[in-house]
A protein has these predicted regions:
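Conserved beta-strand-loop-alpha-helix junction that forms the acyl-donor binding cleft
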Residues: 128-143, 147, 157-160
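A short, internal acetyl-CoA/4′-phosphopantetheine-binding micro-motif in the GNAT/acyltransferase core
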Residues: 97-108, 131-133
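Conserved GNAT-fold acetyl-CoA-binding loop/helix
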Residues: 30-55
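A short beta-loop-alpha structural element at the N-terminal edge
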Residues: 7-35
Length: 175
């Protein structure tokens, strides 16, 4: 990444323009997920599926943090960090990366890696990152950034077609 490029992460709830930007690129995010054909993500335009409803849920969920990923003061991506929930048979986690998106034109520039490091530092605790095994680009990205961030000190499991990385992040200065 160019050393003159500044990447930051900010609370998208604090800015109407960040929310509008996320709404404007949400369809691109769903397009990226569509080839996975998991059945979890509705087909665009499907009866009963309304994208604004999903975004409204994110912004009203008190257990989630909606973040704008910013390059040189302009949004280029978003992330949603969810508080972990205990699930039978799984180790407890404090945070999960529920959603993560970088605009296509901004990919492979180091922005995602930098944003992830900022997010992990901001939310100290036990993390779980989950990606579909059928999404090799996501698996490769998350393995690289988690290994770099943790210096290889993480656990990975493959369960039911999902790859899960679990690790401890650093001290959080603020949210």
């Amino acid at each position: 990444m160019d050393s003159t490029v500044t990447v930051s992460v900010r609370d998208a709830r604090a800015s109407d323009s960040d929310r509008l930007w996320i709404e404007s690129v949400y369809r691109n995010y769903l397009d990226d997920l569509a080839p996975l054909n998991t059945g979890i993500f509705p087909v665009l335009g499907e009866v009963g599926h309304r994208e604004p409803d999903q975004i409204t849920r994110w912004f009203s969920d008190s257990t989630a943090f909606v973040l704008a990923i910013v390059k040189n003061s302009k949004p280029v991506g978003f992330a949603m960090v969810a508080r972990g929930t205990s699930q039978p048979g799984r180790p407890p986690v404090d945070f999960r990366m529920a959603e993560f998106f970088i605009a296509r034109s901004q990919r492979r520039l180091g922005i995602g890696r930098t944003a992830v490091q900022l997010i992990f530092n901001r939310f100290a605790g036990r993390w779980e990152i989950t990606e579909y095994l059928r999404n090799p680009a996501a698996v490769s990205f998350w393995r690289r950034v988690v290994a770099l961030y943790t210096q290889g000190n993480y656990q990975e499991r493959i369960v039911n077609g999902e790859v899960r990385q679990m690790f401890q992040s650093g001290t959080a200065p603020r949210r």
